[in-house]
């Protein structure tokens, strides 16, 4: 049993990215699907598919690299952890690397990026930073 499934999700992506793997698989859940959709929309991954394995399912993530095999994802960092939750009000929504990266928040209106949260005028739990 995992104590922090989101940290495991980010670690699997980080490890596959560091090893230049084309794909990685993570156990499926609603929040992981939402995080993966944001990664796709923001251009950090090529795509993903949900694979039914007869249990909870898996998400197969297709990683993205540049022309000369440079990594598109430079870094991933878990911010709000089970032992220390981190929340941001609507005025405190963080900017990652001056807008070059994204912060992903869990808000009352669902999982969204820092830009979307600022546009909606809401805050929430800061899940992670990706740059």
From Swiss-Prot:
SUPFAM superfamilies: Ribosomal protein S8. InterPro entries: Ribosomal_uS8, Ribosomal_uS8_CS, Ribosomal_uS8_sf. Coiled coil: none annotated. It holds the Pfam family Ribosomal_S8. PANTHER family: 40S RIBOSOMAL PROTEIN S15A. Part of the 30S ribosomal subunit. Contacts proteins S5 and S12. This is Small ribosomal subunit protein uS8. The lineage of its organism: Bacteria, Bacillati, Bacillota, Clostridia, Thermoanaerobacterales.
């Amino acid at each position: 049993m995992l104590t922090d499934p989101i940290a495991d999700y980010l670690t699997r992506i980080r490890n596959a990215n560091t090893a230049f793997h084309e794909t990685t698989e993570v156990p499926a859940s609603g929040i992981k699907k939402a995080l993966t959709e944001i990664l796709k929309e923001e251009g950090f991954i090529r795509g993903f598919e949900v694979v039914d394995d007869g249990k909870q399912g898996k998400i197969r993530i297709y990683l993205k690299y540049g022309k000369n095999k440079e990594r598109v994802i430079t870094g991933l960092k878990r911010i709000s952890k089970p032992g220390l939750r981190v929340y941001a009000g609507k005025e405190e929504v963080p900017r990652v690397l001056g807008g070059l990266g994204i912060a992903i928040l869990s808000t009352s209106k669902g999982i969204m990026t820092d830009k979307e949260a600022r546009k909606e005028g809401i805050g929430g739990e800061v899940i992670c930073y990706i740059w």
